Design a protein with these regions (language model features):
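Extreme N-terminal starter segment of soluble prokaryotic enzymes
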Residues: 1-3
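A short acidic Gly-Thr/Ser loop motif
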Residues: 6-11, 34, 200
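Short glycine-rich, Thr/Ser-proximal phosphate-binding strand/loop in the N-terminal lobe
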Residues: 12-56
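Conserved active-site "lid/cap" helical segment
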Residues: 37-85, 129
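Short beta-strand-loop/turn "lid" adjacent to the catalytic site in phosphate-handling enzymes
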Residues: 70, 76-122, 142-144, 151-159
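Flexible, glycine/proline-enriched loop segments at strand-loop-helix junctions
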Residues: 112-123, 170-181
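Conserved phosphate-binding catalytic cores of ATP/NTP-utilizing and phosphoryl-transfer enzymes
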Residues: 124-136, 180-197
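Conserved small/polar residues in nucleotide/adenosyl-binding loops
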Residues: 198-204
Length: 204
């Protein structure tokens, strides 16, 4: 099973293609400086590598380049995007709308785009990348969005409200959301695993 992982930033589009039977990296790269003087860097798991300047007016063109480097030329690793079993996208801001990972639909993309007021540098590029991916991935291929804010969604109100007029929260949605939740989830999971191993060893 091959999984494509995408991280669309404000002016970049990073990706990794993983072989999930051993979680090895088949290919990875970055379309950088989107909207300026674009540049692509791509590398395969067996060491093939390209660096070239490209024109990326938007994340849509960057995603088209991503497809090109995966399916053709010196960095070709698949014959077509149909070889990809699923796609995962990292999304910065889920606000109070998205509290867990979910499948991508047109409605989900629209909601992510609408939350750009809370993450203006990130959420609109996320939506562009999602739409571009949806256009080139065969219909029926599951796409999943993972939100940085989801890990922190159980914060109590007394922790996430600021000492500001309450209307700042009710009208403008100004509150603490928490970020880098995917990293926090991984670290906390690893900590629990290591502590469990340690306590098991101590018991023996």
């Amino acid at each position: 099973m091959k999984i494509l992982v995408v991280n669309a930033g404000s002016s970049s589009l990073k990706y990794q293609l993983l072989d999930m039977k051993d979680e090895s990296v088949i290919a990875k790269g970055n379309c950088d400086r989107i909207g300026i003087d674009g540049h692509v860097s791509a590398k395969t798991g067996d060491g093939r590598h390209i660096e070239e300047d490209c024109n990326f007016p938007t994340h849509t063109e960057a995603f088209e380049k991503l497809v090109e480097v995966l399916t053709s030329g010196e960095t070709k690793v698949i014959d077509s995007m149909s070889e990809i079993s699923a796609v995962g996208h990292r999304i910065v801001q889920g606000a109070e709308v998205f509290k867990e990972t979910c499948l991508v639909t047109d409605e989900v993309i629209d909601q992510i785009d609408a939350l750009a007021e809370l993450a203006p540098v990130h959420n609109h590029p996320h939506a562009l990348a999602l739409r571009a991916c949806k256009a080139v991935i065969p219909a029926g291929t599951p796409q999943v969005v993972v939100f940085d804010t989801a890990f922190h969604s159980t914060m109590p109100r007394k922790a996430y409200l600021y000492g500001l007029p309450y209307e700042c929260y009710t009208d403008l949605h100004v509150r603490k959301y928490g970020f880098h939740g995917t990293s926090h989830r991984f670290v906390s999971g690893e900590l629990a695993r290591v502590c469990l191993l340690y306590t098991s060893d101590a018991a023996d």
